[in-house]
Curated annotation (Swiss-Prot):
SUPFAM superfamilies: Cytochrome b5-like heme/steroid binding domain. The keyword Kinase does not apply. It is a single-pass membrane protein. It comes from the Eukaryota. InterPro entries: Cyt_B5-like_heme/steroid-bd, Cyt_B5-like_heme/steroid_sf, Cyt_B5_heme-BS, Cytochrome_b5. It is found in: Endoplasmic reticulum membrane. It comes from Arabidopsis thaliana (Mouse-ear cress). Coiled coil: none annotated. This is Cytochrome b5 isoform B.
Amino acid sequence: MGDEAKIFTLSEVSEHNQAHDCWIVINGKVYNVTKFLEDHPGGDDVLLSSTGKDATDDFEDVGHSESAREMMEQYYVGEIDPTTIPKKVKYTPPKQPHYNQDKTSEFIIKLLQFLVPLAILGLAVGIRIYTKSG
């Protein structure tokens, strides 16, 4: 294996994103899968949607057979420059601000929720008594 593998940038590989010229990146290797598009069991859309990015996760998630992995070697064209692949950023949800609410307003609301219906009931009873005696 005296041959030096050609090194491609992700930008260069991304230019090959059509059905007549389709390259993908899997495990740091670049493959020209144009001739395989029609034969791919998942259809050509699967491969075309994997262009322009590191498709390793897409490839591994499907669970390809050992024969599929061996078949890939015939489409090998070089290596990807790892510095051109964007780093995967782990999503961290934004921190929720801590609200230091005044407990007094909460207490007043609960008190009013109790007193207002009680006052309405008292008013209704008072009107009833007043109209009966009058």
